[in-house]
Structures are given as C-alpha cells and as structure tokens.
Amino acid sequence: MASKGPSASSSPENSSAGGPSGSSNGAGESGGQDSTFECNICLDTAKDAVISLCGHLFCWPCLHQWLETRPNRQVCPVCKAGISRDKVIPLYGRGSTGQQDPREKTPPRPQGQRPEPENRGGFQGFGFGDGGFQMSFGIGAFPFGIFATAFNINDGRPPPAVPGTPQYVDEQFLSRLFLFVALVIMFWLLIA
C-alpha cells in the first residue's frame, strides 16, 4: 500500500456531493499527483506505464531505452531480476484519454498476455550442466561430496590440463603436496 495507485477520490464512497474530497483537486491530494504512477527509472509520472513481472513500474519509453542500451544483460533496474520486452505488462487505467500513441516515438509496448507456465518435469538437467539438481552428503562438520565430485554433478570447472604443459606440471605438484599434507595429518591423528 506504499505504492501510489489511483486516487481514492474516484471511488463511489468519496464521490458523494457535500464532501470536499469529491473533487479531483481536493485538499487531501498533493496537486492531483495521487492519481498517477511514478516510473522507477525517471521518477516522474509514468507515461504508457508498464509493470515488470517482479512488480516494478516504469514508463515504456524509459524501459525501452534501458533495454536497448543493455542488450546483453537485460535486468530490472530496481531488483536486477531478468526482464525483457515479453516480461512486462502494460497498465491501463481510467482517465487516460488524450495520450499520444507511443508507436510514434518508440516501438509499441507489448500487448497484455498471459504466458503459459514453464513445465519442468522431474529432475530435468540432472548432472548435465543445466543448473538442475545438486546433492551433497555430510555428517556434522565433515561433508562427503564423493558423489558430487566423482560423477561431476553440476560442476562448472574447465577440463583438466593437457599433460606436458606448465599448468599440468603445477597441478601435479599441488596434488602431490596436498596428498603429503593429508598423509601427515592422518599420521599425526594416529599417533596422537
């Protein structure tokens, strides 16, 4: 209820004669600005208002410019959620007569539509790098990522280095060093 919405003066209860709030420029309103929406980009009255799926309101010209200047990373200017031309909904309201057609200045805002929900059946992408299911087993402070590491589940690491390269030599040295450290720790635990 903190967002600005249509004025309460347009409701049937407040439009009765005899009350000062019955007029559109009543004392309770700040210059008639309560009947408008504010764009989250230009912070002005929203022209050709659209709302994103994450719930933020913008002018269509402002949002169109935002999307055009960032074609590779289209995110909501407020919360950084994914946003695109297809993921905004136009807002229509009473008293919007006399507006200029937005197609003359920028491409038209998208039509209102209800997209079908995505069907993600089961464990789609399990272990194939799709960002699907990831598991890890553990007891107390000792995590056992045996299955996750052995089967390369959801692992985004690059392939191992080619034998004979300096990177391969460094990796082998570190591997032997950590093996030696692990053996020393295990030996210390046995004699302690």
Swiss-Prot record:
Residue ranges with Low complexity bias: 1-27
Topology, Mitochondrial intermembrane side: 152-171
UniProt entry keywords in alphabetical sequence: Autophagy, Endoplasmic reticulum, Immunity, Innate immunity, Membrane, Metal-binding, Mitochondrion, Mitochondrion outer membrane, Transferase, Transmembrane, Transmembrane helix, Ubl conjugation pathway, Zinc, Zinc-finger
Pathway: Protein modification; protein ubiquitination
InterPro entries: RNF5/RNF185-like (IPR045103), Znf_C3HC4_RING-type (IPR018957), Znf_RING (IPR001841), Znf_RING/FYVE/PHD (IPR013083), Znf_RING_CS (IPR017907)
Highest taxon of source: Eukaryota
Catalytic activity as recorded in UniProt: S-ubiquitinyl-[E2 ubiquitin-conjugating enzyme]-L-cysteine + [acceptor protein]-L-lysine = [E2 ubiquitin-conjugating enzyme]-L-cysteine + N(6)-ubiquitinyl-[acceptor protein]-L-lysine
Stated name of the protein: E3 ubiquitin-protein ligase RNF185
Originating organism: Pongo abelii
